[in-house]
């Protein structure tokens, strides 16, 4: 079948490299090699160890690894991950701190669907969990979704976000990280028009390409240079028979990873060379800085072909969100209809993926939003990863975002309480009606309960 051979070829190459690494590690670790007065075998074993781990991580979904959290009362509590909404292409999950009362701050982290799993936001979740109830969009690997589940493009993605926001209520504070920023803005505008009472309380857009033409990067240059026909021929493949999604057209995560690494090839090459030397000297460990970062960075997932292609064509080439011309399910969204959601943008001055200017463009589109509900921040010296997971996030951006949420807490909380009360009433009403409708023992069949004496 067309494109399936190339998908299986990539998987074969990955598998072969993993096997070569394991073989080299085994050969270099034989006790007899210690007799050779030469570090060659030690270096071969180290190369094999690093290579095997690297190629193995590419197909493994990482665990969240968030087992406990220290709350404000100083107690360490267990953390459980609960699925609130389950869908074929992604779930809405909540991190429950066992025994902790619900927090006033409720935060929905919209994870990017750009080749990595939602666990890329692990440190972000960790930093917010002591301060808030945290919810995350957990997107699924397209290779594991049967073709029978249908398509999933940027319109479907937007409608998923709309449903998740509706489920969580109007006192939710949404933080969109990178890729989903324009679609999260569109979802908020969709609710502003069609279901105003379900709008989130605040919306924070972190390093998202709202207007890709505002500042050029390698990503935007690639989008302009390549035609959609070329992109479909070069990037789209069909999932092989090894996975549940056999036959589904996807943009493979391995291709996305290759693109990411080529942008900083010299840095990655040095990082792996240094790690091989550390393993040789016995200085490396399972959870050292290199392995902690690359175990997550190398774990990639496939995206549906229609999602990837529609992202490039409609968001980058046609700039539909930037032009306020985005259409969802036949409905043209007007971002100017957002009037009651406080919006903040965050950018990094050294972001080479979403350059400064691309994200802050969202504020110009919000023509119906009062100026006092708009805010922006440019973090000096921060790169793309740093603005949501690095030192800049922990020390500067996180406290600023939490303050922004607190400053804009208010009427939405009252709306949320009202909606929850209505939901609870709706749940109890059928049970009460059923109990009322059931005949009592005194009128069963119209017969008396006692025989008169």
Predicted regions span which residues?
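Short, surface-exposed "cap/lid" segments of acyl-processing enzymes
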Residues: 67-145
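N-terminal targeting or regulatory segments adjacent to alpha/beta-hydrolase or S9 domains
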Residues: 1-75, 418-453
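Conserved alpha/beta-hydrolase "acid-adjacent" motif
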Residues: 352-358
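Gly/Ala-rich beta-loop-alpha elbow adjacent to hydrolase catalytic centers
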Residues: 176-184
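Catalytic histidine-centered segment of alpha/beta-hydrolase-like enzymes
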Residues: 377-396
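Alpha/beta-hydrolase-fold enzymes
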Residues: 1-43, 47-48, 170, 187-306
């Amino acid at each position: 079948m067309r494109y399936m051979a190339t998908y299986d070829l990539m998987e074969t190459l990955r598998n072969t490299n993993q096997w070569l690494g394991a073989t080299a590690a085994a050969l270099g670790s034989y006790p007899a090699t210690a007799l050779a007065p030469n570090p060659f075998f030690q270096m071969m074993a180290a190369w094999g160890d690093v290579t095997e781990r690297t190629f193995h991580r590419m197909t493994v979904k990482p665990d969240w690894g968030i087992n406990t959290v220290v709350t404000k009362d100083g107690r360490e509590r267990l953390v459980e991950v609960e699925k609130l909404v389950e869908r074929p292409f992604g779930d809405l999950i909540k991190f429950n701190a066992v025994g902790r009362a619900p927090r006033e701050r409720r935060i929905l982290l919209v994870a990017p669907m750009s080749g990595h799993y939602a666990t890329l936001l692990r440190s972000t979740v960790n930093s917010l969990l002591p301060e808030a109830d945290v919810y995350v969009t957990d997107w699924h690997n397209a290779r594991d979704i049967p073709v029978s589940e249908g398509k999933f493009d940027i319109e479907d993605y937007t409608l998923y976000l709309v449903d998740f926001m509706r489920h969580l209520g109007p006192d939710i504070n949404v933080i969109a990280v990178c890729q989903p920023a324009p679609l999260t803005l569109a979802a908020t505008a969709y609710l502003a028009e069609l279901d105003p009472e379900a709008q989130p309380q605040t919306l924070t857009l972190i390093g998202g390409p709202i207007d890709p033409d505002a500042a050029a990067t390698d990503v935007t240059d690639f989008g302009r240079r390549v035609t959609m026909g070329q992109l479909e021929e070069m990037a789209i493949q069909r999932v092989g028979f090894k996975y549940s999604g056999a036959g589904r057209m996807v943009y493979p995560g391995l291709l996305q990873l290759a693109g990411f690494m080529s942008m900083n090839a010299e840095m990655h090459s040095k990082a792996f060379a240094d790690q091989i030397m550390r393993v040789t000297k016995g200085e490396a460990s399972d959870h050292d800085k290199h392995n902690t970062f690359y175990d997550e960075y190398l774990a990639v997932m496939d995206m549906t072909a229609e999602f990837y292609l529609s992202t490039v064509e409609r968001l980058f080439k046609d700039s539909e969100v930037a032009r306020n011309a985005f259409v969802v399910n036949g409905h043209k969204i007007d971002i100017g209809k957002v009037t009651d959601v406080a919006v903040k943008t965050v950018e990094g001055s050294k972001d080479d993926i979403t350059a400064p200017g691309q994200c802050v463009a969202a504020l110009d589109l919000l023509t119906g939003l009062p100026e006092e509900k708009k805010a922006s921040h440019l973090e000096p010296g921060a790169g793309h990863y740093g603005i949501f997971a690095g030192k800049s996030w922990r020390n500067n951006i996180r406290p600023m975002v939490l303050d922004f949420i607190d400053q804009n807490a208010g009427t939405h909380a009252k709306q949320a309480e009202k909606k929850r009360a209505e939901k609870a009433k709706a749940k109890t009403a059928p049970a009460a009606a059923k109990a009322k409708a059931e005949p009592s023992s005194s009128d069963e069949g119209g017969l008396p309960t006692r025989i008169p004496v």
